[in-house]
């Protein structure tokens, strides 16, 4: 991948991850998630599940890999629910 393109993609993913992390942090502060929840790590996991699930679903031409990846990621976030 061209370095300029890589940096642009990196910025895109960082912004997306930051938005997810901010939302998860608000959930933690508001008592929706336990205090030991790590919003940054959870955001990384959600984004990885989304992107990985999307890639697998596209290559398989089947939505099931996306469903499985997101179900697992969301279940992990829910495991921190109060």
Model-based region annotation:
Residues 1-8, 34, 54, 58:
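Short amphipathic alpha-helical segments at helix-loop
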Residues 1-21:
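Short secondary-structure transition hinges
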Residues 5, 35, 39, 62-66:
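Residue-level recognition of alpha-helical structural elements
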Residues 14-32, 49, 60-82:
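C-terminal peripheral helix-coil segments that are non-catalytic and often amphipathic
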Residues 37-56, 72-76:
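Hydrophobic alpha-helical segments that form the core
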């Amino acid at each position: 991948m061209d370095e300029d393109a890589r940096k642009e993609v990196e910025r895109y993913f960082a912004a997306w991850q930051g938005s997810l992390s901010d939302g998860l942090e608000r959930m933690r502060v508001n008592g929706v998630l336990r205090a030991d929840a790590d919003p940054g790590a959870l955001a990384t996991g959600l984004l990885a599940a989304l992107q990985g699930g999307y890639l697998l679903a596209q290559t398989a031409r089947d939505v099931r890999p996306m469903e499985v990846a997101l179900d697992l990621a969301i279940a992990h976030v829910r495991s921190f629910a109060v």
